[in-house]
């Protein structure tokens, strides 16, 4: 069993000074000698703490405008020295051991996220001494503790208090892992930034070149949120990893209020439902089954929206995922638990009364994800293929009503335009080939994932007929263009009065002529929404 190691000397050098003064004060009160640099040393000294500048400790001043501060044998020897092995070398070179290193790095990510950031700005925010100390301390975690996150300050102090000023090996090892993760993420961000600037080679300062969105090598770091019982199928091992520092309301950041542990498929389906419901400003409900919306509706309140969404396809809604864009209230919660079996309910917030209602069904997973008003976080989608990874920008595209191009003789009415926009938002989240029928802010039929677009149209009609929903007078959305007129003919047979689609087929005119023959109004968006 490893013996806890006492903390007698600490080196503190942080860019993010959150909590550092209180932490340093507690260390001082525990009898720890404080070494520090630059702004951190200034902050501690101004607070009256007895802090020793690194330059005084090494006998060598900071040079090159602070570029060289801690890169000195007395610092790295003190960190890397193996206790019980290197004492003679330390004594010969007048090196004192450093037991605790507290470092976080220059804010490179925040710097390059600024649209006014120049190449020189980025270069000056590449930390050199910090990562070197972090890696040295993490390497020598047998004897040295490394802290890179202010969230761990209280943990360190609590353990020191319980162990007479010492820290256990398990804590040092865990913090060392965090340190290596921290430097890996940091170096990955730098590599991504410079890898996307390959055409700027030779620029002396900054340049006006158009840089690639995608670097030569792509580095990402995710943190495991939980192990899962299994993957998409029971014979597959799985875990859920989340992006670091994500701020957007999402399934990754949601708080589970009750219910069984989320499964792999629960998480995937909940993401599909939540991202779809985010598209709507009015109170809305989205019900998802196997990653496809099977019912979507808006209403004056979420209870009305849920009632209407459920009516689209009550059969498929069984065991589905339900997402709302308003707080879940008790009336809506009652309607759900009294009516159907549901796997997951997710909403921005959940009232106390709604929590009590849902608690009667203890297995239902209830999630609160927070508000997303105005959020559109930049980012990428990833799709693994054997031996590689497809990377693309997230699909934030959505046309406005005024951008629609009317291509038929008959123009859609104002009511039809509203339904067309609603239907287009739903189609964006239906697996291709996607055909969606909608009427009065409610889906009446969804045809998803067919190899032939006309069969998706037929299935949407069949689904509506199965639930005794009236298609006549509805509108239709297609996630991509119609390659032939047969999809329009099928829509006309079902009673569709208006169509929204991207356009762009070689046979667009044939499709337009078909719509005119049937008296159907049709608009082009100029934007496709394939979803695979």
UniProtKB/Swiss-Prot annotation:
The record's NCBIfam families line, in alphabetical order, gives: PRK00881.1 (NF002049), purH (TIGR00355)
Gene Ontology cellular component? cytosol
Instruction: For this UniProt record, give its keywords in alphabetical order, as a comma-separated list.
Output: Hydrolase, Multifunctional enzyme, Purine biosynthesis, Transferase
> Which segments constitute the MGS-like domain?
1-148
This entry's Enzyme Commission designation comes to: 2.1.2.3, 3.5.4.10
| Domain of life assignment | Bacteria
Catalytic activities = (6R)-10-formyltetrahydrofolate + 5-amino-1-(5-phospho-beta-D-ribosyl)imidazole-4-carboxamide = 5-formamido-1-(5-phospho-D-ribosyl)imidazole-4-carboxamide + (6S)-5,6,7,8-tetrahydrofolate; IMP + H2O = 5-formamido-1-(5-phospho-D-ribosyl)imidazole-4-carboxamide
Q: Which family does it belong to?
A: Belongs to the PurH family.
Instruction: Cite a single GO BP annotation.
Output: 'de novo' IMP biosynthetic process
Pathway assignment reads: Purine metabolism; IMP biosynthesis via de novo pathway; 5-formamido-1-(5-phospho-D-ribosyl)imidazole-4-carboxamide from 5-amino-1-(5-phospho-D-ribosyl)imidazole-4-carboxamide (10-formyl THF route): step 1/1; Purine metabolism; IMP biosynthesis via de novo pathway; IMP from 5-formamido-1-(5-phospho-D-ribosyl)imidazole-4-carboxamide: step 1/1
InterPro entries, alphabetically?
AICAR_Tfase_dup_dom_sf (IPR024051), Cytidine_deaminase-like (IPR016193), MGS-like_dom (IPR011607), MGS-like_dom_sf (IPR036914), PurH-like (IPR002695)
In terms of Pfam families, this protein maps to: AICARFT_IMPCHas (PF01808), MGS (PF02142)
Q: Does the keyword Transcription regulation apply?
A: no
Q: What is known of its domains?
A: The IMP cyclohydrolase activity resides in the N-terminal region.
Provide the gene name from the record: purH
The UniProt GO MF terms for this protein read: IMP cyclohydrolase activity; phosphoribosylaminoimidazolecarboxamide formyltransferase activity
Protein name as annotated:
Bifunctional purine biosynthesis protein PurH
